[in-house]
C-alpha cells in the first residue's frame, strides 16, 4: 500500500526533468522516501532524484515498492492541477490514483520489470565550481544557435563556456569572484552536447545554484537541489557524457 501527498510544483519539476531524457521511469518508494534513476536510450545522459519523506505532505508505504510509469501520462495528470495545489497519490493494484482538488483520475502502471534501473557510475573529480543557475543558463542560451556542443574550461581564474561555428562564436567568462565556490589548481577543459544541457536547465526552475564537476574530456556531474521545501530539499544529480573533439 502506497499513499502519498506531494505539492504539484515538486511533482511537475520531477516529471519535467525526467522527460528530458526518457519516456518511461521506475520510481522506488521505501521508508526513506522516493527515488528514481533514469538514463536516456543513447546512454549520454543520466538523472538521479531523491525525494526525502519529509518533502511529502503525507507519506505512507508498507515497505519497499516500485512504481513504473509512462511520463507523458503523468504529465497529462499534472496539467489538470493548479500549481498551488497538492496532489494525493495512491497505488491501487495495477493503477495509480490521483486526487487533485475536485478531480480524481487514475492511470495504468507499467510492468516494473520492463524498465531497467541503471547503476550510477563512479564519476568523481576534485575540480568543481558552484555557479548561479542564472549565470550558467545565460552561457548556454548564448551558444544555442551557434553549435551543437559547448566547451567548459575551469581554472584558478574562473569558469568559461565557449561555443563556435565557422562564422560565429560565443563565450561566457565568470571570474572567480563571481563563482560561489570552486576548487581547481590547474586548467581543465571538456566539451558537452548542448541539446541535453539546454533541456536540463529549462526543466529546473526552483534551484538557485549548481555544482559542476568535471576533468579533461570527462563526464560532467551537476549536483543540485530543488528548493520547493527548504526543510526537505529534493536532491538531484545530472550526468552527461563528454563530446570528444577532433
Curated annotation (Swiss-Prot):
One of the record's GO molecular function terms: DNA binding
Keyword terms: DNA replication, DNA-binding
InterPro entries membership: DNA_clamp_sf, Pr_cel_nuc_antig, Pr_cel_nuc_antig_C, Pr_cel_nuc_antig_CS, Pr_cel_nuc_antig_N
The UniProt record lists the keyword DNA-binding: yes
Pfam families: PCNA_C (PF02747), PCNA_N (PF00705)
PROSITE patterns, A to Z: PCNA_1
BP GO terms, sorted: leading strand elongation; regulation of DNA replication
Subunit organization: Homotrimer. The subunits circularize to form a toroid; DNA passes through its center. Replication factor C (RFC) is required to load the toroid on the DNA.
HAMAP family, sorted: DNApol_clamp_arch (MF_00317)
Function: Sliding clamp subunit that acts as a moving platform for DNA processing. Responsible for tethering the catalytic subunit of DNA polymerase and other proteins to DNA during high-speed replication.
PANTHER family (UniProt xref): PROLIFERATING CELL NUCLEAR ANTIGEN
Family: Belongs to the PCNA family.
Protein name: DNA polymerase sliding clamp
Amino acid at each position: 500500500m502506497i499513499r502519498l501527498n506531494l505539492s504539484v510544483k515538486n511533482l511537475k519539476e520531477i516529471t519535467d526533468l525526467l522527460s528530458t531524457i526518457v519516456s518511461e521511469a521506475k520510481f522506488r518508494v521505501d521508508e526513506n522516501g522516493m527515488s528514481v534513476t533514469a538514463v536516456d536510450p543513447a546512454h549520454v545522459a543520466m538523472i538521479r532524484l531523491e525525494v526525502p519523506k519529509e518533502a511529502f505532505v503525507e507519506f505512507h508505504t508498507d515497505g519497499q515498492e516500485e512504481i513504473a510509469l509512462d511520463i507523458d501520462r503523468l504529465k497529462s495528470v499534472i496539467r489538470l492541477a493548479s500549481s498551488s495545489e497538492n496532489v494525493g497519490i495512491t497505488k491501487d493494484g495495477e493503477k495509480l490514483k490521483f486526487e487533485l482538488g475536485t478531480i480524481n483520475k487514475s492511470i495504468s502502471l507499467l510492468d516494473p520489470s520492463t524498465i531497467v534501473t541503471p547503476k550510477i557510475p563512479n564519476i568523481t573529480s576534485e575540480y568543481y565550481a558552484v555557479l548561479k543557475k542564472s549565470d550558467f543558463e545565460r552561457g548556454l542560451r548564448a551558444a544555442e544557435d551557434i553549435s551543437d556542443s559547448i566547451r567548459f574550461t575551469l581554472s584558478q581564474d574562473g569558469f568559461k563556456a565557449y561555443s563556435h561555428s565557422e562564422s560565429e562564436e560565443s563565450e561566457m567568462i565568470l571570474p572567480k569572484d563571481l563563482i560561489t565556490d570552486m576548487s581547481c589548481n590547474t586548467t581543465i577543459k571538456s566539451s558537452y552536447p548542448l541539446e541535453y544541457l539546454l533541456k536540463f536547465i529549462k526543466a529546473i526552475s526552483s534551484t538557485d545554484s549548481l555544482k559542476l564537476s568535471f576533468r579533461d574530456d570527462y563526464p560532467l556531474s551537476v549536483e543540485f537541489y530543488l528548493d520547493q521545501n527548504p526543510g526537505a530539499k529534493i536532491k538531484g544529480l545530472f550526468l552527461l557524457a563528454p563530446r570528444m573533439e577532433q
